[in-house]
């Protein structure tokens, strides 16, 4: 389904039915389609402190479905201790576009990387520098961990509304994943319908750059699709979905009024994409001895103690010249 764009006081609102203002003075929702999946990269390696837009000329970004999905379960509360625990990597995003400044959410998952939605990065129109990130933002006057400017964008190769954003270090040469501890990703082996979850981000119907948490339950789970019964609004795009262990199980994208909100579920395909593109991303089971991806697992082919590793001097492979028993 495609959204209709209606002009309201020189601002644009994307919705399937009616134009709805969704924030302080002039915040609106924007929809967009996924573009190509190729990385967009700039040449800069160090950034200036990003300019922070304030006031009412901010427009929340939301997916092509609907901007505001307030369900009967509207259990939303503000997080004021934003630098504590799993809240710290939750990030306020601004995208400076020709049509205005748009707001969204994301979550830091690596030394210099963050996850958000494809439709959020589409608002940059190919210019990564247009996207600014403020991890742990408290309000529009309080950014305890400063701001960072994007330098590269990589979109998920599948259908899911997911994108990776890489950032330049700040003026102190600190990376975004050094000023906050990156979030832990769930392996989702035990994730199922009816489990309690939270979605944490920066909704556009609340004061600018304030973090809010919504509580609810998973109602549907299949492939990369996850649905839940909690409420969100424009600006929540890219918010992390946490399980009860405070691990990220998905990335919120939007919803359908009176029905559900939804996220890209981190299933095996998504997990493989993330591991291929984010070297230091951490999944909850990575440290388990039996995890084949754990470098200390003796069965991991990259483990130097694995008898089948060609670099192991005890490997009887004929090609290992360091093994005296090799033919």
Swiss-Prot record:
Catalytic activity: Preferential cleavage: Glu-|-Xaa, Asp-|-Xaa
Location of the active site: 119 (charge relay system), 161 (charge relay system), 237 (charge relay system)
Annotated gene: sspA
Maturation and modification: Proteolytically cleaved by aureolysin (aur). This cleavage leads to the activation of SspA.
Gene source species: Staphylococcus aureus (strain MW2)
Protein name: Glutamyl endopeptidase
Site (Cleavage): 68-69
Pfam families: Trypsin_2
Record's compositionally biased regions (Low complexity): 40-54, 286-327
Entry function: Preferentially cleaves peptide bonds on the carboxyl-terminal side of aspartate and glutamate. Along with other extracellular proteases it is involved in colonization and infection of human tissues. Required for proteolytic maturation of thiol protease SspB and inactivation of SspC, an inhibitor of SspB. It is the most important protease for degradation of fibronectin-binding protein (FnBP) and surface protein A, which are involved in adherence to host cells. May also protect bacteria against host defense mechanism by cleaving the immunoglobulin classes IgG, IgA and IgM.
Cellular compartments annotated: Secreted
Extra information: The cascade of activation of extracellular proteases proceeds from the metalloprotease aureolysin (aur), through SspA to SspB.
């Amino acid at each position: 389904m495609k959204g209709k764009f209606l002009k309201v006081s020189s601002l644009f609102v994307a919705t399937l039915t009616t134009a709805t203002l969704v924030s302080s003075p002039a915040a609106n929702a924007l929809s967009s389609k996924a573009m190509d999946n190729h990385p967009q990269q700039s040449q800069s390696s160090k950034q200036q402190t990003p300019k922070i837009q304030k006031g009412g000329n901010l427009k929340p970004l939301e997916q092509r479905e609907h901007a505001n999905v307030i369900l009967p379960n509207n259990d939303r509360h503000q997080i004021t201790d934003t630098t504590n625990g799993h809240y710290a990597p939750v990030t306020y995003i601004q995208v400076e576009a020709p049509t205005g400044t748009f707001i969204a959410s994301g979550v830091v998952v690596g030394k210099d990387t963050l996850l958000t939605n494809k439709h959020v990065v589409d608002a940059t129109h190919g210019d990564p520098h247009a996207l600014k990130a403020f991890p742990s933002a408290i309000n529009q006057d309080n950014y305890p961990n400063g701001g960072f400017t994007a330098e590269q964008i990589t979109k998920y190769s599948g259908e899911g509304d997911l994108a990776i954003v890489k950032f330049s270090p700040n003026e102190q040469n600190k990376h975004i994943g050094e000023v906050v501890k990156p979030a832990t990703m769930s392996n989702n082996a035990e994730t199922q319908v009816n489990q309690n979850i939270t979605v944490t981000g920066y909704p556009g119907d609340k004061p600018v750059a304030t973090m809010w948490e919504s509580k609810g339950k998973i109602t549907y789970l299949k492939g990369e699709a996850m649905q839940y019964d909690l409420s969100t609004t424009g600006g929540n795009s890219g918010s992390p979905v946490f399980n009860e262990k405070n691990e990220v199980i998905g990335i919120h994208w939007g919803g359908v009024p009176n029905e559900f909100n939804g996220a890209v579920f981190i299933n095996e395909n998504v997990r493989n994409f993330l591991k291929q593109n984010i070297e230091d991303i951490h999944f909850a089971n990575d440290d388990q001895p039996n995890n084949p991806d754990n470098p200390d697992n003796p069965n991991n082919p990259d483990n130097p103690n694995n008898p089948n590793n060609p670099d192991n001097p005890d490997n009887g492979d004929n090609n290992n010249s360091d093994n005296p028993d090799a033919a």
